[in-house]
């Protein structure tokens, strides 16, 4: 643990915590401060000027990042018959119906990153909602994961589709790549995500929309990013 702490402290010295960096500078720093022996993920954290307790101020959407996330997303699909066959052909990792729901319910199995369901299967999926919901795995029409077009849904997820949504603290947390992507690809992913978040601004949101932005690698320190470079508020 002491060794990890030393690396973190060394990385932290490279960052001025009083500065909100330009995107290219922040992306360069997040690569330089990643000292772990594994390929660290990079996450963006955006604090928004909304009140997500109100339904009309919840910010939520999806985007296929230009360079993906660098993670092989495991996809579970709840479907029957022809749609189940389509899901298998499209590259779904797990396909089932009541049997899949039962495995989750009885064994507590959650060996996937995203769940997709056809609309007719939501009655079955609903029974395990209290297991899937807290893990952020519940299929949702707004996220494009409740659909008859299972082929497109699976391909988009595998290509790097991510969902962004405000949590109870009005913060969005999204993976935007791996350190191995390099600064340019990380910056391009962040820019694409920020444009999507800006477009999703609720009409009822008043005042400053993007309150703060931070990016960090898995084991690295947080790096502040100037939100004004993405759009004038």
Swiss-Prot record:
Domain of life: Bacteria
Pfam families (alphabetical): Ribosomal_L1
Keywords: Repressor, Ribonucleoprotein, Ribosomal protein, RNA-binding, rRNA-binding, Translation regulation, tRNA-binding
CC per GO annotation: large ribosomal subunit
GO MF annotations in UniProt: rRNA binding; structural constituent of ribosome; tRNA binding
A biological process term (GO) from this entry: translation
Keyword set includes tRNA-binding: yes
UniProt keyword Zinc, yes or no: no
NCBIfam families found in the cross-reference section: rplA_bact (TIGR01169)
Family: Belongs to the universal ribosomal protein uL1 family.
PANTHER family found in the cross-reference section: 54S RIBOSOMAL PROTEIN L1, MITOCHONDRIAL, LARGE RIBOSOMAL SUBUNIT PROTEIN UL1M
Subunit structure: Part of the 50S ribosomal subunit.
Reported function: Binds directly to 23S rRNA. The L1 stalk is quite mobile in the ribosome, and is involved in E site tRNA release. Protein L1 is also a translational repressor protein, it controls the translation of the L11 operon by binding to its mRNA.
HAMAP family from the UniProt entry: Ribosomal_uL1_B
Name of the featured protein: Large ribosomal subunit protein uL1
Native organism: Finegoldia magna (strain ATCC 29328 / DSM 20472 / WAL 2508)
Origin organism lineage: Bacteria, Bacillati, Bacillota, Tissierellia, Tissierellales
């Amino acid at each position: 643990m002491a060794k990890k702490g030393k690396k973190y402290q060394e990385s932290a010295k490279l960052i001025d915590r009083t500065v909100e960096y330009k995107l290219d500078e922040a992306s360069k720093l997040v690569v330089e401060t990643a000292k772990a022996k594994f390929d660290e993920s990079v996450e963006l954290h955006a604090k928004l000027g909304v009140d997500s307790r109100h339904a009309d101020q919840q910010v939520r959407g999806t985007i296929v990042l230009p360079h993906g996330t660098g993670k092989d997303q495991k996809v579970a699909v709840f479907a029957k018959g022809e749609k189940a066959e389509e899901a298998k052909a499209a590259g779904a990792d797990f396909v089932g119906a009541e049997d899949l729901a039962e495995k989750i319910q009885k064994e507590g199995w959650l060996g996937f990153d995203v769940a997709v369901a056809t609309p007719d299967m939501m009655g079955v999926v609903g029974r395990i909602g209290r297991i899937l919901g807290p893990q952020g795995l519940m299929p949702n029409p707004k996220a494009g994961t409740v659909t008859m077009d299972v082929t497109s849904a699976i391909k988009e997820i595998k290509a790097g589709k991510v969902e962004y949504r405000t949590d109870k603290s009005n913060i969005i947390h999204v993976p935007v790549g791996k350190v191995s992507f390099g600064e340019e690809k990380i910056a391009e992913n962040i820019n694409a995500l920020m444009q999507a978040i800006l477009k999703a601004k609720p009409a009822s949101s008043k005042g400053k929309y993007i309150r703060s932005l931070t990016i960090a690698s898995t084991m690295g320190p947080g790096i502040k990013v100037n939100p004004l470079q993405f759009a004038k508020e």
